A protein has these predicted regions:
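Class I SAM-dependent transferase core
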Residues: 1-35
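A generic structural signal for alpha->beta connector loops
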Residues: 10, 62, 89-91, 159, ...
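Conserved Class I SAM-dependent methyltransferase catalytic core
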Residues: 18, 142-199
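Conserved SAM/SAH cofactor-binding pocket of Class I
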Residues: 32-129
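Mobile active-site "lid"/loop adjacent to the S-adenosyl-L-methionine
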Residues: 120-147
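General small-molecule cofactor/ligand-binding pocket signal
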Residues: 14, 93-95, 186-189
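Residue-level signal for inorganic ion chemistry
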Residues: 29, 119, 148, 206
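SAM/dcSAM-binding transferase cores
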Residues: 198-246
Length: 246
């Protein structure tokens, strides 16, 4: 993705200050997540804030999104992008700092969120670059699975949902952490970037109370056919409200 502003159909985000730009993982998470009945959503590891804005676009009037970001430059960009959101009757606010302290700075939000989303720094024990900001955005040294699950459980109200995206090789680890904290699995979507390739990512939705007996629903999402940008109808159905040219 380009380093300059990224223009969605209904909003734009500045991203020159964020180590990680608008990308497919966040696009999939933001378009897939259900916002029905959501009054308060929190995006953990928000980067430049675009996932939160994707949610806000579909949320009702009177609702709010918070974006929580640790890395300083990305957090400032998140604060700017969320404060400039164009959706009437809705509000958005960025917050700079570690999510492990968010509940201390915002105690009024403990147990109040209907939805938490996260496209977290999900690489564990992988080679790092010389760019510290990029390492913060990609590696889990400062936000482990346990940190994320515990923070989300603290901030969500009973019945609140946690939606995330992870590499496929961390599925069992995430299931162990989430169920151990007290979440119940509702939906899992296994993502293939192309039909002929193995699964690369998975989306998961967990609820802070038991899900329906027929859960956990297992699905597969294929992003592209046999060529780059040959988007499948399945993927286009998700991204058409957002991505120009679709």
């Amino acid at each position: 993705m380009a380093k300059g502003p990224f223009h969605f159909k209904s909003f734009s985000v500045e991203q020159d200050g964020a180590a990680m730009k608008v990308g497919m993982d966040g696009m999939v998470l933001g378009s897939w997540t259900d916002v029905n009945g959501v009054d308060l959503a929190i995006d953990i590891g928000a980067g430049n804030g675009y996932v939160g804005l994707m949610l806000l676009q579909r949320m009702a009037q009177g609702t709010k999104v918070y974006g929580v970001e640790l890395e300083h430059d990305a957090a400032q960009q998140c604060i700017e992008n969320l404060s400039n959101q164009p959706f009437a009757g809705r509000t958005a606010e960025g917050w700079s700092g570690p999510v492990q302290r968010f509940h201390l700075e915002k105690p009024e939000l403990v147990g109040m969120a209907d939805l938490i989303v996260s496209n977290p720094p999900f690489y564990k024990n992988k080679p790092k670059s010389q760019d510290n900001a990029r390492n913060l955005a990609r590696h889990d040294d400062t936000l482990t699975m346990g940190d994320l699950a515990q923070s989300a459980h603290r901030l969500l109200k009973p019945g609140g949902r946690l939606c995330t995206i992870w590499p496929s090789d961390r599925l069992e680890e995430w299931e162990s952490w989430s169920s151990g904290i007290g979440f119940d699995a509702c939906r899992t979507v296994h993502i293939k970037t192309m039909r002929h390739l193995p699964e690369k990512r998975f989306l998961s939705e967990w609820r802070k109370q038991p899900c329906a007996p027929e859960s956990n629903v297992q699905e597969t999402l294929i992003l592209e056919g046999s060529a780059t940008l040959d988007f499948t109808d399945q993927y286009l159905a998700f991204i058409q409200p957002y991505l120009r040219g679709t």
